[in-house]
From Swiss-Prot:
Keyword line: Ribonucleoprotein, Ribosomal protein
Name this polypeptide is given: Large ribosomal subunit protein bL34
Top-rank taxon, per record: Bacteria
InterPro entries in the cross-refs: Ribosomal_bL34 (IPR000271), Ribosomal_bL34_CS (IPR020939)
Coiled coil: none
Keyword Iron-sulfur: no
PANTHER family: LARGE RIBOSOMAL SUBUNIT PROTEIN BL34M, MITOCHONDRIAL RIBOSOMAL PROTEIN 34 FAMILY MEMBER
The family this protein is said to belong to: Belongs to the bacterial ribosomal protein bL34 family.
A GO CC term assigned to this protein in UniProt: ribosome
PROSITE patterns per the UniProt record, alphabetical: RIBOSOMAL_L34
Pfam families recorded: Ribosomal_L34
Region (Disordered): 28-47
Length: 47
């Protein structure tokens, strides 16, 4: 049986990366919430 999680950095960044977040109003709200919470990393693409 094939496992469901088949990692790909490209797909990960396209869906959850910084530019993907900035592209929509709701994505920007996500970033704002994470900034307010004090997250060290805002998105998966940020080191």
């Amino acid at each position: 049986m094939k496992r469901t999680f088949q990692p790909s950095v490209l797909k990960r960044n396209r869906n959850h990366g910084f530019r993907a977040r900035m592209a929509t109003k709701n994505g920007r709200q996500v970033l704002a919430r994470r900034r307010a919470k004090g997250r060290a990393r805002l998105t998966v693409s940020s080191k």
